[in-house]
């Protein structure tokens, strides 16, 4: 992990296309601006963790539903013969 100190109106560059600018520092809060290409997704970490958890729940639900559908198809086709 790289640790840097920055003052208000100073920035860091990540590769050539991402810039993180320090806008404001108050007590225990730092306000930043991030300039990045539109195809780069930027999330607050707590939001990103929430998205990951919701995606995991969705996958488990889908697996359960697929299993139910498979069971119904198997039951249906066994009764057709």
Swiss-Prot record:
Could you give a single Gene Ontology term from the biological process aspect?
A: mRNA catabolic process
User: What GO annotations for molecular function exist for this entry?
Assistant: mRNA 5'-UTR binding
Subunit comment for this entry?
Homodimer; the beta-strands of each monomer intercalate to form a hydrophobic core, while the alpha-helices form wings that extend away from the core.
Family label: Belongs to the CsrA/RsmA family.
Among the Pfam families in the record, one is CsrA
Protein's UniProt keywords contain Repressor: yes
- Biological source species: Borrelia garinii subsp. bavariensis (strain ATCC BAA-2496 / DSM 23469 / PBi)
Annotated Gene Ontology cellular component terms: cytosol
Known role: A translational regulator that binds mRNA to regulate translation initiation and/or mRNA stability. Usually binds in the 5'-UTR at or near the Shine-Dalgarno sequence preventing ribosome-binding, thus repressing translation. Its main target seems to be the major flagellin gene, while its function is anatagonized by FliW.
Q: What is its main location?
A: cytoplasm
Q: What is this protein called?
A: Translational regulator CsrA
Q: Which InterPro entries match?
A: CsrA (IPR003751), CsrA_sf (IPR036107)
The disulfide bonds in this chain are none
The domain of life is Bacteria
Name the SUPFAM superfamilies on file. CsrA-like
